Amino acid sequence: MSQQMPTYTYPRPSVATDVVTLRVHEGRIEVLLIERAETPKGWALPGGFLRVGGPRIELAAAKGATHPKVDASLEACARRELKEEAGVDPRKLHQFGAYGNADRDPRGRYVSVAYWTFVHNERCRPKAGSDARSFEWRSIDKAKGLAFDHDDIVKDAHRHIRRRRYEIDLFLDLMPAVFTYPMFKDAYALFWEGERKVDRSNLHRKVASEWAAAETDTPLASPGPKAAGAPAKRYDLEQVRRLMGAKP
């Protein structure tokens, strides 16, 4: 007897993913937005619909088979859409919420699963593609008036990250391949805004010994203005990740 995927008669909302892509630039947190080419137009987060196949394809996918036109998971959908619409291929995505209010999309009932990710300019060269007319980086406090409920998604992502601010290894994705402690400290401190200030002396004590084995003589790609005093120690990002046990 052949196996078949079960079918049901109740209505099914479409499933989508949206990605909050963040960087630190010139002392502020910025979010990547795309200008939608399709209706409803406006600025929005990169994202799109989960691609599914027919019963046979989905049955095979449930058994581990892959198909070029089917998303094997929600994360696969988020990665594909971010790549197609903005040309960004993040190292890691973090799922933080789902959105399905009846009034969130004028086209119908859609459920979106939201992710956030950190990037650095060195590893991120956005370009508009597929459904996007253009893209821009916008300060997170000015990411307002976006399409759908994306204002709320951006705010929720920011809150979620701030709740995880003690997981120091998460913030390494904001750094270039070679970085200094002051570069990391300044980026990390931005996510403490509105809370008590980060204890910089404790932070330095925590990472100084842990990162010692990752010191490098490789020059910074963008040195910036020369600071007074001894040059800051430089660290190799991948070595720091390994020392801190950051997940790949």
For each of these PLM feature ranges, what is it?
Residues D89-G97, K197-S201:
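A short coil-to-beta-strand element that immediately follows conserved catalytic motifs
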Residues Y10, Y99-V111:
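Acidic pyrophosphate-coordinating catalytic loop
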Residues R196-P219:
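Charge-enriched amphipathic alpha-helical scaffolds
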Residues V31, E35-W43, G47, G54-P55, ...:
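Short, His- and charge-rich active-site/binding loops that engage polyanionic ligands
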Residues R28-V88, E167-T180, K185-A189:
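Conserved Nudix-box catalytic region and its N-terminal flanking loop in Nudix hydrolases
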Residues A114-T117, R125-R165, L174-A187, N202-E210, ...:
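NUDIX/MutT-family hydrolases
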